[in-house]
Amino acid sequence: MTRIDRRSFIAAGLATTAAGLLSAQPAAAAITPAAKASSMAPHWVARPRSESSAERARRWGRDTWTSLVAMTDRHTGLPADNIDASLAAADRSGYTSPTNIGGYLWSAVAAQQLRLISHGECSQRVRQTLNTLAKMDHHRSSGMFYNWYDESSGEVLTSWPGTGDRVYPFASSVDNGWLGAALMVVREAVPAAAKLAGQLYDRMRWDMFYDRDASRPGGLIHGGFYDAPPPPGSSTFTGNHIGIGPDVWYTNHHYDTTVSETRITSYLGIIAGQIPPRQYFAMWRTFPAGCDWSWQESQPAGVTRTYLGLDVFEGAYSYRGMHIVPGWGGSMFEELMPDVFVPEASWAPRSWGHNHPLHVRAQREHGMIEAGYGYWGFSPASDPFAGYREYGVDALGLNPDGYFSDREKTNYDPGFGDCRPATNPTPTYGDGVVTPHASFLAMMYEPTAAAANLTKIERELGAYGDGGFFDAVAVRSGTIARRYLSLDQAMIMGSLANVLGGNAMRRSFATRQVSRRLQPVIGMEQFGASAH
């Protein structure tokens, strides 16, 4: 069973992986806890200690928006994938993706809702980006965009900036999903851009990614497709699920777990009437509990229920007195990013309504109690020690190799009942790595605890610059990834718009039509998640 994380998979268009694509810039020297107070940057030492929690959160939003503006080309309205701490145009990454473009669009709406920019500026920015999108090369039969573009021109990348490595244009199901979600938000929230946003969205065929003949009854979503011969050695097959235009090269990889950011594509297909609702129940909650599946992280417990004619094993993992439906890696991003747009907890109170707050609690308890880091919030991010890495809480992931929470990749292994003995049920953790965007997502469920955690990250660790929170920080060494990632900053903006702006993202996305089509589907389910 081949599994590729979304953020790794979007790089599949490269013939070879370019080293250091998102290389972080560690601090010149590691900072010991005792030395932190004397080594804090002047920028954040000057922050007022008397500001209210709401004022502090709005300041965080304002500075985060500053980084997104700095990433965005003033001629095309396209954001770069990332930018260094300098926020200088010369330090932009030189490439962007549909996810990044979508993130900038919903961030502009969030900035307006938070009163950081005017209605007029929001409309101008959004329309500029949409006008560029309308001219960009894409897969015309499906309306889907390719994975990498030059943000300064909008041209499809065929060679990687800085290395010259060949790029094979690839249409990713989940990256187009985030662009689609953003277009839905814009269509509802920005009247001056509604027509163009609607035109771009309406041409997107989500069933292009839907494989009704996949291994799971109900069908699964492909990772994506190439519309020209793929890189040598790629695992693909040719076909065309919508029967329009030439055949494409589909990935043999599918997204088959529910607690994943990739469920946004299933949602959009169901909303559009292009993917049958039962596809939502084709994905695993956990894998089965038998010894044949003992390769997964731990042994789930649960019962089988039937929805829309499909039997679903409602498994959950046990962690610190909680029963939680795990993701693939145990990251906040997998659990909560779709919830920025779809009010999952209220629409599905017996499933997501249990799992979301339990996942947040589990991440907090892992960082503060089990690992003793003193900070929490674990999700894929820039690696403070160079590059990019998936971070998470290993115990909350199906993947036995984990998304680990520390630099040392400390592996939690509780065993699998009588099938596999435990090798490391009570680990000793090392230099934990937290990413602020995880705490902003968590703020939708634990606002006070998340804000307190972020305040400590800013004041005690100094992981803050002119563009808001730096992407990640190792809490014991004090090593900081001094860079801003477009997607992570956009998750911060979307979360703040919900927390401070009266669920602005959800209100714009979850229209009556969306509710009629999606809420009955996700609302019928009962997860195995619960607190003891």
Question: Predicted regions span which residues?
Answer:
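Low-complexity, intrinsically disordered short peptide segments enriched in small/polar/basic residues
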Residues: M1, R7, A28-A29, P42
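N-terminal secretory signal peptides and thylakoid transit peptides that target proteins
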Residues: M1-T17
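Short, polar/charged, Gly/Pro-enriched helix-capping and turn/loop motifs at alpha-helix termini
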Residues: T16, S23-A24, S118, R506
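Intrinsically disordered, low-complexity, compositionally biased regions/tails
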Residues: T16-T17, A24, N147, L396
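Residue-level marker of structural boundaries
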Residues: A18-A19, G501
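C-terminal region of N-terminal signal peptides and the immediate post-cleavage residues
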Residues: L21-S38
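Ser/Thr/Asn(+Pro)-rich, low-complexity disordered segments
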Residues: S39-H532
